[in-house]
Amino acid sequence: MSIKHSKFRKTMAVLAGVLISAGARAQVPPSHPPVALSGASATQQEAKMAANAATKFTHFRVGSKNVKSIFVDGALVWVGTSGGLVRYDTRDDSYKLFDGKSGLLSNGVFYVGRINGRLTVGTYGGGLSFLDERSGKWNNYNIPEGLGDAFVYDVVAAKNGDVWIATWSGVNRVIGGAFDDRSKWHLYTVENTKGGLPNDWVYGLAEGRNGVIWLATEGGMARFAKGRWDNWNHSRGLGAPYEKVKDSIEFKNDPGRASSHHAKQKEEMGLSNVDVAFNPNYVIALEIDRNGDVWAGTWGGGLSRYDGKRWVSYTTSDGLPGNHIFMLHLGVDGKLWIGTNSGLVTWQNEKFSKPLTVADGLFANNVFAMASSAADDLWVGSYGGVAHLRLGK
């Protein structure tokens, strides 16, 4: 097999050491939700070609780190890890690492993208940061500037110019994207929305039709439309019932055992007797397809789809490789990619494709991040690195 990025693989081997040492210097809290490592050996994971000869993978290692976000920016690929932000230039296989030494307030990067033209990073404990690409300096925004919490999971620029920021203490709305005007910062919480926002831990954001903002939280899905809040949880159809998934729950390390926060959630749902990682109210991933349907990835309750009237849930019995959904991504061609705890699958024409796993070339079976290039190449992030899938090549 011809590997186009063999030079980059060598530079990434060097970078792995950089990231490991960076992680030692700046201790980043463990990722949330907990991560299960792939069981594949290094040999199985390295530059493996898919069984389908039309599909090719190249692996880029980043050491003992999670890849939590990827952003394809023309010829540049930005990779957010638990050990810093990597900028990779596909034109010459060069890379640069941004971390605490570069001006970031945290090495844990959970969001990377462009907001109002600026390279933007949401971090794990370091707030929101914008990169001045000419000077290489970071402009940081944290709680004193109006941010609800220092833990930032997602950022969305709405068509009306407002910027929404998902945090662990509610969701910020910056009117007109005026970050330097404190009066433009608003924070929505469970308390000040009177329960309209079902939980203050917000993981995902997306703008739907007519400017509707959708939010994925630890207490279910929320919708903000024309100043009004609505929400859905398991009792309103979100996530598959435990009886449907109980025999296919991979993670036995229930967060409720170690966290009073999660234990209380399960108690409120009547799930105290369920001693595995299952909480269908806990929505980790969110995407909206071309039809306007809303997709929600749950913690053990499979994948749920809202068509404007009701929620329908899909599980391993319907073709998913796993019931813990970590990432949802809409490809250039409109195909929905679903990253799970047991591989990667697509949804198109009302059915799931055959799953891709480490046996087919994925770096690991846990898929945490995805991004597409203009040519519809797919970059897939997992624990330890990124797999570059060149579709149709």
Language model regions located:
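Bacterial N-terminal signal peptides that target proteins for export
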Residues: 2-12
